[in-house]
A protein has these predicted regions:
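A generic structural micro-feature
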Residues: 56, 130, 175-177, 196, ...
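Short, contiguous, pocket-lining structural segments
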Residues: 173-177, 192-196, 214-218, 231
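C-terminal transmembrane beta-barrel domains of outer membrane proteins
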Residues: 33, 63, 79, 93, ...
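Short beta-strands and strand-coil junctions in structured, solvent-facing domains, enriched
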Residues: 15-16, 39, 53, 100-101, ...
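Generic macromolecular interface patches on structured domains
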Residues: 18, 76, 104, 150, ...
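Gram-negative/organellar outer-membrane beta-barrel architecture
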Residues: 3-190, 257-263, 271-275, 279, ...
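Outer-membrane beta-barrel translocator/pore domains, especially the C-terminal barrels
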Residues: 190-199, 251
Length: 339
């Protein structure tokens, strides 16, 4: 019993954990006397990212996240994030459960971001735009068990698309109204957040613009992604599928689907393909080549991935059909973070 009580206290959610035996001496009842913390821990996380392409396409990001937990007796959380680099952004939100079981919740928040992005025509970078956005949102949703979440909400704000390096006659967007209805579903059974060896991750998003919320462009947008990983001894294999559609509507340039880069489509430059609908499929296998710490699950992996996909109604007017790529991968979980 004492070991179980120690395990419960180690969760970090209680100031004190005591127990007592009561009732019939022959068959006593175990009473746990818990005193919940009136405060919660604060988590701070930093991340550093660097991408260098063979054609001079580079990207650098320094990011930090702050999570303040249990700000009230319902388990409310304050979250803030800051990103610096080619993409610079700031986001702040309040996640507030509405009941003691923490199934129903609301989440208001603010988002502001600016990013320098290259525009490609048939594989060649011909312009660079500075995309910027700022909007607020309000979501409400429900958590299902330990793995699934469904939410819906509204957004309202503005979008910009300014020329940074481009011909003077290329179009620009200045403070265009942005707003609409959103829905999002997430299922997550991964054994860990990064480089997981077992589990399924599913994400699906839907957005429909609404003039009453400030939108100037009339369009719909749906996108989904699923990744399943399967352990193979100390190694693992995974399959990933993703796709998106505008349902025949014309997406504004700031909300086009984008693929290209080491994550979405290895072999393409970051953001090389932009369009109104797409699909991708990927199979990968990673072999453990070095173990750093079995206690913390830290190891180095090497392997490869094969990717196929197609982007339709591309911004450059080209229709290339299905394209393929192969990639060699070196990755891992290290004491300094993911590699």
């Amino acid at each position: 019993v004492a070991n179980r009580v120690d395990t419960l206290f180690a969760l970090g959610d209680f100031e004190t954990v005591r127990y007592a035996l009561s009732g019939d001496k022959a068959e006593p009842d175990l009473e746990l006397r818990l005193n919940e913390k009136s405060w919660g821990p604060t988590f701070v996380r930093f991340d550093l990212g660097l991408y260098m392409g063979t054609t001079g396409n580079t990207a650098f990001t320094l990011a930090g996240d702050v999570l303040r937990t249990w700000i009230n007796d319902r388990g409310g959380e304050l979250n803030g994030s800051l990103r610096l680099g080619r993409t610079t952004g700031l986001e702040a939100s309040l996640y507030q459960p509405l009941d003691t079981t923490q199934r129903w919740f609301v989440q208001p928040g603010l988002n502001a971001q600016t990013s320098l992005e290259d525009i490609f025509i048939d594989g060649d970078a011909v312009a660079r735009y500075d995309f910027a956005e700022t909007w607020g949102y309000l979501d409400a949703g429900r958590v299902f068990g330990n793995h699934a979440e469904l939410r819906a909400g509204i957004r309202s704000g503005w979008q910009w698309a300014d020329r940074d390096i481009a011909f003077p006659d290329l179009p620009e967007i200045s403070a265009e109204g942005y707003g609409g209805w959103t829905a999002r579903y997430t299922y997550d059974s991964r054994d860990r957040e990064l480089l997981w060896r077992d589990g399924l991750l599913v994400r699906a998003n839907y957005f429909e613009s609404e003039e009453g919320l400030g939108a100037q462009a009339d369009y719909r947008r749906a996108e989904g992604m699923a990744i399943y990983a399967l352990p193979v001894f100390d190694n693992f294999a995974y399959v990933r599928g993703a796709g998106g559609s505008s349902f025949g509507s014309d997406l504004p340039v700031y909300d086009l689907f984008v693929i290209g880069g080491p994550v979405s489509f290895p072999g393409l430059n970051i953001g090389e393909l932009r369009g109104d609908s797409y699909w991708t499929a990927q199979f990968g296998y990673l072999q453990q080549v070095a173990e750093i710490s079995s206690v913390f699950g830290q190891a180095i992996y090497a392997g490869g991935a094969f990717t196929a996909g197609q982007m339709n109604r591309r911004i450059d007017g080209f229709e290339s059909g299905t394209i393929y790529s192969g990639a060699f991968i070196v990755s891992g979980r290290t004491p300094l973070g993911p590699l």
